[in-house]
Amino acid sequence: MKWEVVIGIEVHVQLNTASKIFSGASTAFGAEPNTQASAVELALPGVLPVLNRAVVDKAIRLGLALDANINQKNVFARKNYFYPDLPKGYQISQMDLPIVEHGKLKILVGDQEKVIGVTRAHMEEDAGKSLHEDFQGLSGIDLNRAGTPLLEVVSEPDMRSVDEALAYVKALYTLVTWLGICDGNMQEGSFRMDVNVSVRPEGQKEFGTRREIKNLNSFRFLEQAAKYEIQWQIDTLEDGGKVQQATVLFDPDTGETRMMRSKEDAHDYRYFPDPDLLPVRISDEQVARIKGEMPELPGAMQARFVDAYGVSAYDAALLTSSLAQAQYFEAVAKASGQGKLAANWINGEIAARLNRDGKDILDCPISAERLSGLIARIADNTLSSKLAKQVFDALWDSELSADAIIERDGLKQVSDVGAIEKMVEEAIAANPKAVEEFRAGKEKALNALAGQVMKASKGKANPAQVQDILRQKLS
């Protein structure tokens, strides 16, 4: 039997406000336990929450970027459950009237575009954290994280493969960091993913029973967890078993998911409007102000890069994986006048070297100005591709310009026709067998002769000119 995968994803986006959603306590990461928990987070009697308006602005910003409806009246609700890191006994969230509804996000899988529906994005507070490793036989509670503002972004179950799920979360990650509403630090919990997975026989309309994989904090873990869960569900069904709705956790050490608890539905949390918080009213003027402050969005910039610089849609998507990378590319492309070459070097050598060194484009040791200098010398045939890589290595490890490195190391490409002709004639005279083979129709023999010329020139001869002159001499 053939199976179809159905995936929906909930992402908890931690907003980068200086203070918490309902108090003035700091949201800074890494402080000593319980040093950043105010009376609101501690749930002391008589203390009332006060909404941080910056949270609302950031939520509107995301809603606009998702081309979603911004609800002009939205309501906070209490989500009731007991857990030691939640002193109030409820979490302040949104249920029936969230701030953002009915959005969409375009993804690219290979060369195929797809639009994923975004059901809603709602504001809520984060819970505290349980500490198990610091106490023998006991657990500690750290409430520093409690009250940190979150946007929970809920997708439609529109994804049909792990590749689509990865493309969606990466596109959302790019968007929230691009908009400046989230710092994107996944190690610190700024972007946490819950993945709902089900399978059904191909052609069946009804969804299968889903299981939710909780708290994934890396794209690699999402890929591993989803692949394992899909295969587990298929194996269970093909063996005659039933998939029970449940919440599961992913164990990176074993690469497997394991049962956490049977899955609750919304009614289990007994949502009701929070009586301590008035409904949030959003005016047209507020939305217009935020819209006017929005940067050019990744999708629009991708289309512009394709039109203005002639890069492929795939390259444009890579170049806009972050705002900093997009700005770096555009600076190089404008300075050098070579959009395609700039894209090739940034998506190729620059990306590989940054990945090797564990760096981000913001930490790139080659400035846009210095890279554009290298690209200009490739474009005007001063450098061959081989020599360009030598110059690139020197650029990475120094602060010199491409021209200074070329001058210092004598790396200028030889394009003088007379000089190349002399080397070609010497190669032809020294390799009569290769000449005979080429004239007999063996194209590879020409490459062997070209290699001899390049060797004689110490890699500095213009490869295209070498090939042209060889063909002229041997025709």
UniProtKB/Swiss-Prot annotation:
<dbReference type="GO" id="GO:0006412">
    <property type="term" value="P:translation"/>
</dbReference>
<keyword id="KW-0547">Nucleotide-binding</keyword>
<keyword id="KW-0648">Protein biosynthesis</keyword>
<dbReference type="GO" id="GO:0005524">
    <property type="term" value="F:ATP binding"/>
</dbReference>
<dbReference type="InterPro" id="IPR017958">
    <property type="entry name" value="Gln-tRNA_amidoTrfase_suB_CS"/>
</dbReference>
<dbReference type="Pfam" id="PF02637">
    <property type="entry name" value="GatB_Yqey"/>
</dbReference>
<dbReference type="GO" id="GO:0050566">
    <property type="term" value="F:asparaginyl-tRNA synthase (glutamine-hydrolyzing) activity"/>
</dbReference>
<dbReference type="InterPro" id="IPR023168">
    <property type="entry name" value="GatB_Yqey_C_2"/>
</dbReference>
<dbReference type="GO" id="GO:0070681">
    <property type="term" value="P:glutaminyl-tRNAGln biosynthesis via transamidation"/>
</dbReference>
<dbReference type="InterPro" id="IPR014746">
    <property type="entry name" value="Gln_synth/guanido_kin_cat_dom"/>
</dbReference>
<dbReference type="Pfam" id="PF02934">
    <property type="entry name" value="GatB_N"/>
</dbReference>
<dbReference type="GO" id="GO:0050567">
    <property type="term" value="F:glutaminyl-tRNA synthase (glutamine-hydrolyzing) activity"/>
</dbReference>
<comment type="function">
    <text>Allows the formation of correctly charged Asn-tRNA(Asn) or Gln-tRNA(Gln) through the transamidation of misacylated Asp-tRNA(Asn) or Glu-tRNA(Gln) in organisms which lack either or both of asparaginyl-tRNA or glutaminyl-tRNA synthetases. The reaction takes place in the presence of glutamine and ATP through an activated phospho-Asp-tRNA(Asn) or phospho-Glu-tRNA(Gln).</text>
</comment>
<dbReference type="InterPro" id="IPR017959">
    <property type="entry name" value="Asn/Gln-tRNA_amidoTrfase_suB/E"/>
</dbReference>
<comment type="subunit">
    <text>Heterotrimer of A, B and C subunits.</text>
</comment>
<dbReference type="InterPro" id="IPR018027">
    <property type="entry name" value="Asn/Gln_amidotransferase"/>
</dbReference>
<comment type="similarity">
    <text>Belongs to the GatB/GatE family. GatB subfamily.</text>
</comment>
<dbReference type="InterPro" id="IPR006075">
    <property type="entry name" value="Asn/Gln-tRNA_Trfase_suB/E_cat"/>
</dbReference>
<dbReference type="InterPro" id="IPR004413">
    <property type="entry name" value="GatB"/>
</dbReference>
<keyword id="KW-0067">ATP-binding</keyword>
<keyword id="KW-0436">Ligase</keyword>
<dbReference type="InterPro" id="IPR042114">
    <property type="entry name" value="GatB_C_1"/>
</dbReference>
<protein>
    <recommendedName>
        <fullName>Aspartyl/glutamyl-tRNA(Asn/Gln) amidotransferase subunit B</fullName>
        <ecNumber>6.3.5.-</ecNumber>
    </recommendedName>
</protein>
<dbReference type="InterPro" id="IPR003789">
    <property type="entry name" value="Asn/Gln_tRNA_amidoTrase-B-like"/>
</dbReference>
